[in-house]
């Protein structure tokens, strides 16, 4: 059975709740087992992903996953912090995804305000958590179609 790791940034709990609910619903519908790793904010997502990959490389079977989903949110504020954190988060996730041939769905929101975040995280609305899970599942299928192991 396939197994996926959801790495979730909980900086905005009420937004993270919606993203996680959407992702979990998609994996449950697909019959895919999923674990959860929680980090403080989106800046920590790439580091957490790299730690999991390192643990798997060092033989930790509990750290072996067929796919990954990253979830979190950055909301623009009064300073440039949002831009720097969002850029580094996305770069780090993309770099690891390509370097390790990961089946990964990215559900990190970078939005201008809370209303945008709520609309995108709500499973009954834009459901970006669910979209990230579906992207992960599709990339897992692509790897299988190409004969690549997890």
UniProtKB/Swiss-Prot annotation:
Q: Where is the signal peptide?
A: none
InterPro entries linked to this entry: LS, LS/RS, LS/RS_sf
Q: In which pathway does it act?
A: Cofactor biosynthesis; riboflavin biosynthesis; riboflavin from 2-hydroxy-3-oxobutyl phosphate and 5-amino-6-(D-ribitylamino)uracil: step 1/2
State the EC number(s). 2.5.1.78
Q: Which residues form the active site?
A: 81 (proton donor)
Q: Which Pfam families match?
A: DMRL_synthase
Annotated 5-amino-6-(D-ribitylamino)uracil binding sites: 11, 42-44, 73-75, 106
GO CC field: cytosol; riboflavin synthase complex
Q: Which GO terms describe its biological process?
A: riboflavin biosynthetic process
Domain of life of the organism encoding this protein = Bacteria
Q: Return the CDD domains for the record.
A: Lumazine_synthase-I (cd09209)
Keywords in alphabetical order, please. Riboflavin biosynthesis, Transferase
Alphabetized GO MF terms: 6,7-dimethyl-8-ribityllumazine synthase activity
Recorded catalytic reaction(s): these are: (2S)-2-hydroxy-3-oxobutyl phosphate + 5-amino-6-(D-ribitylamino)uracil = 6,7-dimethyl-8-(1-D-ribityl)lumazine + phosphate + 2 H2O + H(+)
Record-listed (2S)-2-hydroxy-3-oxobutyl phosphate binding positions: 78-79, 120
**What is the annotated role of this protein in its UniProt record?**
Catalyzes the formation of 6,7-dimethyl-8-ribityllumazine by condensation of 5-amino-6-(D-ribitylamino)uracil with 3,4-dihydroxy-2-butanone 4-phosphate. This is the penultimate step in the biosynthesis of riboflavin.
Family label? Belongs to the DMRL synthase family.
Q: What is this protein called?
A: 6,7-dimethyl-8-ribityllumazine synthase
